[in-house]
Amino acid sequence: MLFRSPGTGVAPLRALLQERELAFASRSPPPEALLVFGCRFRERDFLYREDWERMERAGLLPGGAVVAFSRDQDRKVYVQDRLREEGARVWRLLEEGAHVYVCGSANKMPGAVRDALADVATEHGGLGEEGGAAYVRGLSLKRRYHLECWS
């Protein structure tokens, strides 16, 4: 499963991960999940940090949450940037049948995430630019791409 969210949009994803944590408490290791989460500042906005660390220790989030702190450095870093950086892992999970959950603002974020996933499919799947976009559309048609966005 791939989870992606900026800011407070992470709340519904936390609930999904907590459910998985309970469901797989007796199964070792649980199926891999990747959380890509964004906020402005590590020290002020890192929501649910303790939960992500506990889930990493339990093996639910191997490597921990992938976090984009957009204001902690000169160049802004967003979740779509982190998705591209994690491209090989994202592609492997998608090819293994992962579902994608995108939660947060309905403004520019959903399109930026869709474009980042298309870039991942293009680069790591060798699909070409049009093939990458078609791959992401296919995820929607297969009901593997889920949006929970608001304005």
Where are these regions (language model features)?
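Short, small-residue-biased leader/transition segments that mark boundaries at the very start
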Residues: 1-2
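Central I-helix of cytochrome P450 enzymes
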Residues: 5-10
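E2/UBC-UEV (E2-variant) core
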Residues: 11-16
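Reductase modules of NAD(P)H-dependent flavoproteins
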Residues: 18-24, 30-151
